[in-house]
Amino acid sequence: MLESLTLHPIALINGTVNLPGSKSVSNRALLLAALAEGTTQLNNLLDSDDIRHMLNALQALGVKYRLSADRTRCEVDGLGGKLVAEQPLELFLGNAGTAMRPLAAALCLGKNDIVLTGEPRMKERPIGHLVDALRQGGAQIDYLEQENYPPLRIRGGFRGGKLTVDGSVSSQFLTALLMTAPLAEQDTEIQIQGELVSKPYIDITLHLMKAFGVDVVHENYQIFHIKGGQTYRSPGIYLVEGDASSASYFLAAAAIKGGTVRVTGIGKQSVQGDTKFADVLEKMGAKISWGDDYIECSRGELQGIDMDMNHIPDAAMTIATTALFADGPTVIRNIYNWRVKETDRLSAMATELRKVGAEVEEGQDYIRVVPPAQLIAAEIGTYNDHRMAMCFSLVALSDTPVTILDPKCTAKTFPDYFEQLARLSQIA
């Protein structure tokens, strides 16, 4: 595979993209299908590194599943209860937060002796707030290296009860607790401390739990009530919707250099908050239309904006590079959690935007981008972060080529991203 990829200037973007399945939905659905009673067929499952890490972990834990040849359909035989390993295990989860956090919680239900570990970057991604909450519910968890970070040793013991969890760093901690709580012996009450970030991702979790037969009552996202002693039930067939974060690159490309691009697999009915990205493009001046299972974007005269994007942290990255093509500065606010993702995305984004000529102010939890009159050809570092690679592909929508280092890092969520982009592109 190429160590670098040079994208030549693109004159026009036009066409339709059938989106790969959502990463957030795929890994949640796999775990719930494994815990549920009955067999679940998951359709449009994402085939990517993060999903493979979840599948490998479930297999090691005794879950049986059958994958179609293209790995997008998966039949999972549910265990009808807890994940329990017969012997001590070590599970390697790469850099998949959507596997590490929910599994860390789910494995606390049984009596286990399991080590969860991953790539070096995973060991820099905080998990202390989740561990604190699980311990309040009786779980025995040890840090094997640095306090508050993986790798973890999990011995089980979670019973439920009254928990508090800090909501200000990652919504995945709450997601992990919510998915685990119905299988605990006792009822669980989860109180959120601080501002709950990425709230729409909690809606994805609640939607999936409901699909598997479990309802959660919450008081304005501040207190969540979950009955204990429940069993998830397979819905039979579950369709994974397209990945809205992945859609953002194609919609932005159309806003800059359309033509018109239609992304299918998400739309008006979508459970993913990242579909709100289309509203941001519309505010900037793009033309957007919605169907039940598609979003369409056409070019418009783009203006810079100043916006709180806490609700769409992943797609907000795409706005940072779209800003290179807008008239006037763009400010993206309330995105502190960029700093604890695949890399410190605030610092990485500021560094690479400056390389292509932008004037950038990097705050603790915001970024301000002033586009240059002319973009500069540059080699873009991707920091082993799939979204950095995809965001900076948009630079090629100018008169300037761009070189993306380590383009294969997109395998985390979208292995054939560059092929899909090329298919829609007319080269200048």
Swiss-Prot record:
Provide the protein's localization: Cytoplasm
The similarity annotation says: Belongs to the EPSP synthase family.
Q: Which Pfam families match?
A: EPSP_synthase (PF00275)
Which residues are listed for 3-phosphoshikimate binding in this entry? K23, S24, R28, S170, S171, Q172, S198, D314, N337, K341
- Listed EC numbers: 2.5.1.19
Provide the function of this protein: Catalyzes the transfer of the enolpyruvyl moiety of phosphoenolpyruvate (PEP) to the 5-hydroxyl of shikimate-3-phosphate (S3P) to produce enolpyruvyl shikimate-3-phosphate and inorganic phosphate.
Record protein name field: 3-phosphoshikimate 1-carboxyvinyltransferase
List the PROSITE patterns hit by this protein, alphabetically: EPSP_SYNTHASE_1, EPSP_SYNTHASE_2
Q: Which GO terms describe its cellular component?
A: cytoplasm
Q: In which pathway does it act?
A: Metabolic intermediate biosynthesis; chorismate biosynthesis; chorismate from D-erythrose 4-phosphate and phosphoenolpyruvate: step 6/7
What EC class is this? transferase
- Which CDD domains has this protein been placed in? EPSP_synthase (cd01556)
Q: Name one GO biological process term.
A: aromatic amino acid family biosynthetic process
Enzyme active site: D314
Q: What is its main location?
A: cytoplasm
Gene name, per UniProt, is aroA
